């Protein structure tokens, strides 16, 4: 990679199934894992603006990876002019076509806020799961976010817009947003249904059978979860129309996927409000292990696992469970401040990078 975060230039060849990146905070450990995540999913869980990923005063950042099957993936982030994706040297018409060859699942200390944090964190987590299963979902999310921004801009223009013209534009927005919203809702619901039985099993294992997990999808529109797609679309369109007075007063759309919630319950009670810190950590760990298992089942091969400073946030028992579950099947990139959390077997089959290897501007490999 070149010009990415604090790395002027870094070249690294992975020689073992596991890469342990060891050192204090601030040397670029998380940045390395973030670069892999970007190549695999086109998304970063740490920021939403590409300009924050490009090294200070650099015109661009370049990420390139070679896979075992010979595939060459490349993503260029430009300070002026957006992104460009290439596969095997060929420029892709759509960034989306870069998704698939490098499936990866990330688990970071930030994910531990999944249970007790705001609903947006759970939506983002569920969206990452859906993207693993259906890469075209990225296009739906992009379309919806553009429509939502354009709708907000229309309201901000306020008095500058003729009321009749504004209502006609809102009618058009309602039709488009209802269609895209329905497709997002259905995919989120489908992914959660696939994930739930696996997550329930992991939660039972992690709690020695004492806790029963329930995952509930609560759409940001008043919908019957069992309805077919067309009734959903019509219901959302009607709700968008009815909420316009409140939308005008508050300045934000009150209906749609951006208001969805995923309810996580243990023993029938909300884990966010009543779960202990240990229960919440076990729940997040179980969800991540379920995600890993589901992707492996569906595609017949294990995804790359990115563990970013998460071991320090888990007690020794949960650390052991996570590392044991990963086993020998998954290629792992792990960042940590110390080697002490890794047993001898893990170290023996790992490539280890220490602070000097990741100093800003150093080229290795």
UniProtKB/Swiss-Prot annotation:
| Lineage of the organism | Bacteria, Bacillati, Cyanobacteriota, Cyanophyceae, Synechococcales
One matching Pfam family: SMC_N
Coiled coil among keywords:
no
Q: What does this protein do?
A: The RecF protein is involved in DNA metabolism; it is required for DNA replication and normal SOS inducibility. RecF binds preferentially to single-stranded, linear DNA. It also seems to bind ATP.
Give the main localization category.
cytoplasm
Which species? Parasynechococcus marenigrum (strain WH8102)
Q: Which GO terms describe its cellular component?
A: cytoplasm
Record-linked InterPro entries: DNA-binding_RecF (IPR001238), DNA-binding_RecF_CS (IPR018078), P-loop_NTPase (IPR027417), RecF/RecN/SMC_N (IPR003395), RecF_2 (IPR042174)
Q: Which Gene3D superfamilies does the record match to this protein?
A: P-loop containing nucleotide triphosphate hydrolases, RecF/RecN/SMC, N-terminal domain
Which cell locations does it reside in? Cytoplasm
The protein's name:
DNA replication and repair protein RecF
Q: Which SUPFAM superfamilies match?
A: P-loop containing nucleoside triphosphate hydrolases
Assigned keywords, A-Z:
ATP-binding, Cytoplasm, DNA damage, DNA repair, DNA replication, DNA-binding, Nucleotide-binding, SOS response
- Choose any GO biological process term that the UniProt entry carries and state it: DNA synthesis involved in DNA repair
Q: Name one GO molecular function term.
A: ATP binding
The entry assigns this protein to a family as follows:
Belongs to the RecF family.
Where along this sequence does the record place binding of ATP?
23-30
